């Protein structure tokens, strides 16, 4: 199903609504009432939305978000009870409910499901700025009108509507800060303006934020046995990070005389992580636990100027209107996501260069290592240039239809959703390709780009230092081949079709209500790639890396029936008891089920997908 075909489905619905709408008679306006909306009222509306929700949910308003210096929605959601956030270098990225795996959480904008950018399933929230949100509903109990993959939680991000404020409105925010370590800048700017009258309305917004920081890592890797662990490797790493987040979009609405609306919404977000890494590694053989001295060790060095891009683009055409006694919602969406990594790595390998080596790792966060000289004196006989690349690019056409009405028992609601997804890319999670000719040290000598020692309060007796990686990268671009492409056996080629239908009935009682429903999801999944042909003898890294490949195509179809029941009992005017039973489905991610494998020449490891995984 392509976007144009989805549009053809929606156009007759819009024409029907216009034909019904034109039958309404114009009415004279006899009175104009102007309403103001205070911050307290906005927060009270969020509280009331939580109380009246048919399921267990947490609701946070835009005004509540604005009281805190949150850069993205992960920080904001982390303030809600029962929700935890996972961080990367101190910054919030993933969201999970009640300690469950983050893959059990799904996300949507205005009810439109967004595929996980990194792997098609798991959503990231660090690219979603707070300015776009009018209200965030974190559903902790899942009803049948929510995606089946929402096992532990479903987060619906509601963006601003033009009709939220009559006439013109304008909002802006500017923030500045500074990191304690390294003095990195923190900036935040956003702007939003809207206009609406009785006939039409529009809202447009833009947002940008940056975070600069230095991340100081010490990472010992252990061997040996429990209680007698010895260090195999000790890493001294420093990252100079600049993260940028940009978003822009808007909504145009045409209001119908029957109270409905036709709307076009655009949402575009982009998160860019620019990361300089300087990584010095000490290797020890046959060491002793905790402390040791008198060893001869080996050194390796990695340095790079990497770029990670995380992008979501969504365009939705929809209609909401009453038709007779029914409330009808229909939406067709085009959703594109991009996850791209480019990391050209200078990888220098030595052996036995570190003499009179001693170490003390009693504090793993601050290991102490000494040897004759410092890292500025170390030379490396092997100098490689490695392209670490990864990417997942998805295109989704989605059609969603929901209809509901009141009946003698309460409310009846049912709907249908169709998703057609294509995922391409490669190098999951990273492909490493050694650039022909190795590292051109005669032209781009790293010694010519040395800077000062690590800015760190920790021990740095080894003399780990910074390199001007961006300038060094510019030099490399003048002499090296262009960015490597994904190897054929690491390319991702996936097509997936999801069809879902649901029905749910709310039974109103004197003491509360019961909501019972059934959701049926049908999945068709196909992946094309390569697998390793049979290799005789030792199946080691070298054999696999050089082994013959053969084409593999796998197609699977399965159907899941997902019932749910929710009970809401009013114990008192300000107390409610909620009991829920729901079922869900955890599909393998595109990375886990791809017909491809990635070979890492740095760690000498292989990671591959399994297209025969079951849901």
Locations of regions flagged by a protein language model:
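N-terminal periplasmic "start-of-domain" segments of outer-membrane beta-barrel proteins
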Residues: 33-66, 94, 102, 112
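Transmembrane beta-barrel strands of outer-membrane/channel proteins
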Residues: 36, 170-176, 204-210, 264-270, ...
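N-terminal periplasmic accessory domains that precede
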Residues: 73-76, 93-96, 108, 123-125, ...
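Short acidic/polar hinge/loop motifs at secondary-structure boundaries
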Residues: 85, 96, 112-140, 191
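Transmembrane beta-barrel wall of Gram-negative outer-membrane proteins
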Residues: 181-282, 300, 304-324, 563-566, ...
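Structural signature of Gram-negative outer-membrane beta-barrels, strongest in the C-terminal barrel
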Residues: 253-257, 314-316, 333-335, 392-398, ...
